[in-house]
Amino acid sequence: MTTARRRPKRRGTDARTALRNVPILADIDDEQLERLATTVERRHVPANQWLFHAGEPADSIYIVDSGRFVAVAPEGHVFAEMASGDSIGDLGVIAGAARSAGVRALRDGVVWRIAAETFTDMLEATPLLQSAMLRAMARMLRQSRPAKTARRPRVIGVVSNGDTAAAPMVDAIATSLDSHGRTAVIAPPVETTSAVQEYDELVEAFSETLDRAERSNDWVLVVADRGAGDLWRHYVSAQSDRLVVLVDQRYPPDAVDSLATQRPVHLITCLAEPDPSWWDRLAPVSHHPANSDGFGALARRIAGRSLGLVMAGGGARGLAHFGVYQELTEAGVVIDRFGGTSSGAIASAAFALGMDAGDAIAAAREFIAGSDPLDDYTIPISALTRGGRVDRLVQGFFGNTLIEHLPRGFFSVSADMITGDQIIHRRGSVSGAVRASISIPGLIPPVHNGEQLLVDGGLLNNLPANVMCADTDGEVICVDLRRTFVPSKGFGLLPPIVTPPGLLRRLLTGTDNALPPLQETLLRAFDLAASTANLRELPRVAAIIEPDVSKIGVLNFKQIDAALEAGRMAARAALQAQPDLVR
């Protein structure tokens, strides 16, 4: 880790020096360079501002002096990135055509503008420059295809909004990042930045420092500590690919830099239960406690090494998830994000609470130790059960905890009966999110949530791997419970040991054939109706774990030991096949 602390000082880079550092101009002689330097115009381009749009006349080229720019195709995808020394717009000038793509500043930048007429005159007089331009055209054609992977964040702003000093936390984050690559820290004295009166002073003073740090490091942490001043805070927000905001007060301040709402944000929570209005204001992609575990998880997200675990629904078979988690964690696999549907949602919430595998398994045993949670049958008006036992068990397990206050990432999936939409729960009550996700239609009453009527997400997405894989911060392990269906032969309303006589079976079902009880039929229907997308075709899937739960009844929660062992065995096999899961 390297740290840069400096005072603002105007750089004053002259045009001749800047142009000489451009690769395509390296072969022109000093006289031509001097003549060109007298015609260029220096411009400051604020962060997020467009330098030009697709379809505009190609009336000039630009040489990047500082900052970072991206080329954006008319369809919206980014296909190239430009930094100090790169030229922008030269191909359009040579072709005499309109701009084929737009260019936008990722952060505050400085460019030198060369008029099209000036550049074409020089091009005709300099054969070596023509060769350089041909090479540049070939490079641009290679880069014009859409990128298959998201660009990783490199400049990370760390902002303190209250009285907590950022420096110790920045050191902890940088130390955690050092295990993944090289990290630099730019943290000028607060008494210096707070005294600056003009924003352009900061751009001039720190652009070169930031460019140099970015070229020689994997990540750069730019720090706006308490008392650093509003201009510096805005500068940090403008330069950053992502922001880390320190939360040390219950409610967010009235004034939050507008750029903070335009960048992906991670929260570091310095208090146990910040108000959800922080999430309303900043819509963070993740939140982490201000401790070593939280700093490590944040560093893994920044580095793209944050591992997710997504788990399928499956009734009692979902107890296998606890065995999978035990085997993975005991082998040293670190998991930061959890998500699932139905029984997978229960396991995800337990793990996101911060329980280790032993505690989670003990809690699962307690969860099923009493009477059957689905044993409060009633007149089937909205469901076969009242749902009261399920409500009490879920509330007793998760209490009033909010998803915003969980130490690890979590989501669950339910389905809205009103709209038919998939609902992804990332905010609000953990108990409510779990309860909605396990509300098997016809068996457990649905959940009212405002205008929504929520039921088990297995109807639409029993293994929401696509939801987890949409997060670009790391790979994903999937636990798939789909197996051959082996129906039981009893009646769901009778004890399993009771085998109904043929006459009674015929009276109740209209057939002599043994049919599965209604509950099993409903759960199996979920497997058939849910998405059958090929998990291996999804991006970022690191492993697919498939416990053999075919001999476990979907409603037989007393088979917990068999389910746990099935999970352990499947995870053990995955680790043997892919030892790189341990990082």
Swiss-Prot record:
The active site is at 342 (nucleophile), 456 (proton acceptor). The keyword Cell membrane does not apply. CDD domains: CAP_ED, Pat_PNPLA6_PNPLA7_NTE1_like. A motif (GXSXG) lies at residues 340-344. A motif (DGA/G) lies at residues 456-458. Residues 309-469 form the PNPLA domain. InterPro entries: Acyl_Trfase/lysoPLipase, cNMP-bd_dom, cNMP-bd_dom_sf, LysoPLipase_patatin_CS, NTE, PNPLA_dom, RmlC-like_jellyroll. GO terms for biological process: lipid catabolic process; phosphatidylcholine metabolic process. PROSITE patterns: CNMP_BINDING_3, PNPLA, UPF0028. GO terms for molecular function: lysophospholipase activity. A nucleoside 3',5'-cyclic phosphate binds at residues 24-140. A motif (GXGXXG) lies at residues 313-318. Keywords: Hydrolase, Lipid degradation, Lipid metabolism. Pfam families: cNMP_binding, Patatin. It comes from the Bacteria. Belongs to the NTE family. This is Uncharacterized NTE family protein MT2641. It comes from Mycobacterium tuberculosis (strain CDC 1551 / Oshkosh). The lineage of its organism: Bacteria, Bacillati, Actinomycetota, Actinomycetes, Mycobacteriales.
